[in-house]
Amino acid sequence: MIKIKNLKKYYGKELVINDVSLEIKKGEIYAIVGHSGAGKSTLLRCINGLENYQEGSLKVFDQEIKDLSQKKSKELRMLRKDIGMIFQNFALMERKNVFENVAMPLRTHYTQCKFHAKLFNKEYMSEKEIAQKVNSLLEIVGLDHKNKSYPRELSGGQKQRVAIARALALNPKILLSDEATSALDPNTTKNILELISKINAEFGITVVLVTHEMDVVKDIAQKALLLEHGQIIGSGAIDELFLRPNAKMKEFLGESDFLPEHGLNIKLYFPKEVAQNSVITHMARTLNIDFNIVWGKIEKLNGKALGNLVININEKDKDKVLDYIEKSGVLWEVAS
């Protein structure tokens, strides 16, 4: 659905997106993560054609965005119809009520005059159909009782729900979210993420999240890409990224391993199918050995509890311990 290969984007002489490649498949929730200035919002704006890029390829629905931006404005407008977007600041019209804000894309894209539709070859939607569509969207986001309210009368979470309804008005296949929860409190953030997950599951909409909030990524993303100074420092499935981070990712996440100098340190990764099993206690009893637990942590990733653990064993027990671990289905590596 979205394929990016060796993408480079410059602002003047400054390289802000540096050789980025990724693929986002239909129906995925994909996070683009980074600190402020990492280039994540710029990358998002390249995806929907709001920013040009100088090198590489960026295809959405198998269409090269650069070609559409430069030569085919009508095709680019049609592509954007299939891409909804929500923002940190909600981007609502303050002088229009909730209903009118959500109806705006429909009234802009469609004509409400059959004569104009025929004369100018435009798509037609009646006011009755618009009202039905808007009311349906407001029901989906839980704001059907607020249709006549104005943005100033809404909480931050309610404003974002209006923005989500508006983004869904033209039945997009992709929903882009640019720091959509960063201005919200934790409880409201949780509710908005649940709504986005529901929309993804029920309508099959591909979701691309730009965020600096790790909890957002862990809550709903299936895959992620981590950017630093416009470069990828990690990408892949969420459990792999957070349970087996590389050195750059550990630095990015502010993590470090403190390990004993004596004995053999083994880091264990518990995939979802064995995360709840008492592998370690069974191993101690079966092999009749002693070992120390150095540290461990459990992460809730996409609603599943996954964990890793570092144990310190005697060097003489290495072969039988590793053989037991292999047979248990637990992933491992010698930590150093």
From Swiss-Prot:
- State the Gene3D superfamilies in the record: 3.30.70.260, P-loop containing nucleotide triphosphate hydrolases
Reactions accelerated catalytically: L-methionine(out) + ATP + H2O = L-methionine(in) + ADP + phosphate + H(+); D-methionine(out) + ATP + H2O = D-methionine(in) + ADP + phosphate + H(+)
Oligomeric and partner information: The complex is composed of two ATP-binding proteins (MetN), two transmembrane proteins (MetI) and a solute-binding protein (MetQ).
Known function: Part of the ABC transporter complex MetNIQ involved in methionine import. Responsible for energy coupling to the transport system.
Q: Which organism is it from?
A: Campylobacter jejuni subsp. jejuni serotype O:2 (strain ATCC 700819 / NCTC 11168)
Q: Where is the ABC transporter domain?
A: 2-254
For whether the record's keyword set contains Ribosomal protein, the answer is: no
The disulfide bonds in this chain are none
**Location in or out of the cell:** Cell inner membrane
Give the similarity note.
Answer: Belongs to the ABC transporter superfamily. Methionine importer (TC 3.A.1.24) family.
> What EC number is given for this enzyme?
7.4.2.11
PROSITE patterns with a match to the protein in the record: ABC_TRANSPORTER_1, ABC_TRANSPORTER_2, METN
Q: What GO annotations for molecular function exist for this entry?
A: ABC-type D-methionine transporter activity; ATP binding; ATP hydrolysis activity
UniProt-recorded name of the protein: Methionine import ATP-binding protein MetN
